[in-house]
Amino acid sequence: RNQFGDSVGIYHSKMTPSARYKAWKKFRSGELKVIIGTRSAVMMPAPKLGLIIVDEEHDASYKQQEGFKFSARDIAIKRAQIIKIPIILGSATPSLRTLKLVEEKKFQTVSLTKRVTQKSPPKFSILDINEVKLVSGLAPQAIEAISQTLTQKKQAMIFINRRGFAPQFICSYCDWKAMCNSCDSSLVFHHQAARLICHRCDSAFGVPTHCPSCSKAQLSFLGTGTEQLEETLKELFPKTAIHRMDRDSTTKAGSLETILSEINNSDTGILIGTQMLIKGHDFPNLELVVTVDVDQGITSLNSSAVEEMGQQLIQVAGRAGRSDGNATVLVQSRYVNDQNLLQLKSGNYLNFAKSLMEQRQATTQPP
């Protein structure tokens, strides 16, 4: 709006129906010249659409998984193709599908070869956590690195793409596991809400004291989420400001802006968060990043898991060292000799993507 004034509007699902309709109507009439929106905005009518920009085009959230399933990225490309207008796909970590289109000369590339701040990228260090006793998912070496960062009056970020307290709730006697009655997904324990919540359909259930299957009182939590990390780090660093940024901590209006303001107005502190943390935010004083659950990407059977792991690692690394170029990314893993992880250690995403493309071609996997 600083550039284009009142001709800029927004469109997303958190708006009231009346506000969404007003934005839709103004864009259709041409009163709004620029619309910034989420997935559904790609279908908004416009009298003279001249350009489509898909920011962070690699992001899996462009895919609508429930109800009417679609990819907003793919619809944007098709729409631009039909009405013969330019489309820009922006990303520091382009999807393999996009890189394949570039290889086939169907897309042109414009590369930014330097960071905006002209500072050196952070150094990657892979931390072997085999035979290491973890504290809420953190290795002692990672905790020590956080402590040193705080001593230097800098900020540390803990990246874990799991919200809630623990991703699994099980019975150690009969192996019962809490599952959603509606969609059969694993239920996640949320401590603050004192509920078992399905992250797929948002169904919520009470927390049983005895196993529904065998009636034994041998229920326990498995795994680590953002809530658990927050509680543990508050115990380890009681005098340090700790900020958690995930879907649960940013539901209230203005809460995200408040968290970001607190982070940017303090020299030191700890940031904990999910993928929400890595989407374009600028944290000038961030000097350390610790990734907790990178092994999910290595062991998952999902064909896109390794690609998404690489994208997340490079994106989260991009938040650090923007002011003095002296940052470190600590990658905790039990697979320290994994070739894809070692490829990412250089911090060069395109080399990683090229290697991954070659692996996929060798096994006849898309793209």
Predicted features and spans:
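Inter-lobe coupling/hinge segments of SF2-like helicase ATPases
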Residues: 1-367
